[in-house]
Amino acid sequence: MKLERKAEIIAVGSELLLGQIVNTNAQFISRHLAEIGINVFYHTAVGDNPERLKQVIQTAQQRSDFIIFSGGLGPTKDDLTKETIAEVVGRPLKLDDEAFESIQDYFKKTNREMSPNNRKQALILEGSDVLPNRFGMAPGMLLEHESRFYMLLPGPPKELEPMFENEAKPLILEKLGSREKIVSRVLRFFGIGESQLETDLEDLIDAQTNPTIAPLAADGEVTLRLTAKHADPEETNRLLKETEDRILERVGEFFYGYDDTSLAEELAKACRSKGMTLAAAESFTGGLFSSWLTEMSGASEYFKGGAVCYTNELKVSAAGVSEDTLQRYGAVSAQCAKELAAGIRVKTGSDIGISFTGVAGPNTQEGHPAGKVFIGISVKDQAEEAFEFQFAGSRSAVRKRSAKYGCHLLLKMMEK
């Protein structure tokens, strides 16, 4: 079937309209469809009402040739996505034996009795390709009907995301009959804003064809998604590398990793590769930096420990800050940050100590405005350093930005 690649995503569920949950599914699906050259032109949310859902489907049929549904595949009476689509397209629902067996097995394994309405989850549109659900009960499906694709996916992201990546995406490519191999690579940057990055790369972004370059800013970071396509996989990778090299020639100092990595993960890798250990003394960040560094398995190889020194008394007893420093300069100061970093390094026997002291907000402290931050770094046999920042945003944003800058500073230090 010839597909014009005009897609629409319809999220089904009254909880979306009531603001009880955020529609992250539409974002996820749109991003993955863009990677394979399918353009999403419309996002629609509709409640659990068959008449309104019917109207939405009929509108989508007039403007889209690929209609994706998320939600409404459950066992309850208000889960009516399949039934409504079946009525609109004139296809009956039939029991999928494999899906039904999978549901029965689930209840046996969990020693629970299956309700009669769970059988409903194994019903599929006649003539559709079934998308197995490895993380739930309701299967998805892809139906070709009158020059359109209808894809039905479960609502919970933990079910939808693996189903889309592992089952739906390969099937879509097969249906499209494309010989081209589409590959994406995400470059991650920190310490540069989206507007500055786009300015530095303006000519490359304006001239993009293959690969395409898509910037995105989130949580104080900027990513560039490069997407290339070619029948020859080697040529696809060559196109990506050529564009990546041109980008990094200009803004490589801010680059820190690929795809789904994080600053904390890259810092953990750097510590491991250099055989260095780390400890942290945190005030207003409240252990956030330490929690990030210990999310990876085997964290004890590089992270010795830390202390949350919120009060001045603990800054003295847990990290060895002198009372004279606190009286003369205050807790929010470069001097305090240096002593915190040095003290925690010595107390834990680590190679590196890092500290965070500042004002998360919203109130001022010691005459400093909200967002004033000092990050201290102490490296064995080297002089301590302190870095001063003024961040904007909420209390949570200041804490996160500070912890990220701590990772960033240590990564840059290890590159020297």
Curated annotation (Swiss-Prot):
Species classification: Bacteria, Bacillati, Bacillota, Bacilli, Bacillales
TM ranges: none
Superkingdom, taxonomy of origin: Bacteria
Protein name: Putative competence-damage inducible protein
InterPro entries the record matches: CinA, CinA-like_C, CinA_C, CinA_KH, Competence-induced_CinA, MoaB/Mog-like_dom_sf, MoaB/Mog_dom
Gene: cinA
Cited Pfam families: CinA, CinA_KH, MoCF_biosynth
Annotated family: Belongs to the CinA family.
